A protein has these predicted regions:
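Short beta-strand scaffold segments in enzyme catalytic cores
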Residues: 1-8
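Residues embedded in well-ordered beta-strands within globular domains across many folds
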Residues: 2, 49-51, 73
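Histidine-rich, glycine-flanked metal-binding segment
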Residues: 7, 35-36
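A short, polar/charged loop-to-alpha-helix boundary motif
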Residues: 17-31, 35
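Immediate flanking context of iron-sulfur cluster ligation sites
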Residues: 42-54
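Zinc-dependent deaminase
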Residues: 59-128
Length: 128
């Protein structure tokens, strides 16, 4: 995950560290927002854009709402736990005090293939 400022400056990057850190909240999106918050000295990430490979889960989606992220761009949809339009859409829910502009499916086939091959490699299987 990469979080950028309105000017295009990279403010934070993140990778899934939940297993390594024994932290169920250490998803790539959360790690990128934590880094950006430290860089800005603020928990609000107003007008920033978050780029991720896979559609965020509910936890990450709500963290993005609380951080006031302006835009989300993701590659592959997540038909099991996607919370930004696939299974449900937390970031556009009018009951929240902030909504996020979403652009999903950007290079979606490539993102899906890369994710599949990553997990296949972890299981000792050849790439697709």
């Amino acid at each position: 995950a990469v979080l950028v400022s309105p000017a295009g400056e990279v403010l934070g990057e993140g990778w899934n560290r939940n297993i390594l850190d024994h932290d169920p909240s250490a998803h790539a999106e959360i790690m990128a927002m934590r880094a950006a918050g430290r860089a800005l000295g603020n928990h609000r990430l107003v007008d920033c854009t978050l780029y991720v490979t896979l559609e965020p889960c509910a936890m990450c989606a709500m963290a993005m709402v609380h951080a006031r992220i302006a835009r989300l761009v993701f590659g592959a949809t997540d038909p099991k736990t996607g919370a930004c339009g696939s299974v449900f859409d937390l970031v556009a829910d009018p009951r929240h005090n902030h909504r996020i502009e979403v652009r999903g499916g950007v290079l979606g086939d490539e993102a899906s293939r890369r994710l599949s091959n990553y997990f296949r490699a972890k299981r000792g299987k050849p790439p697709l």
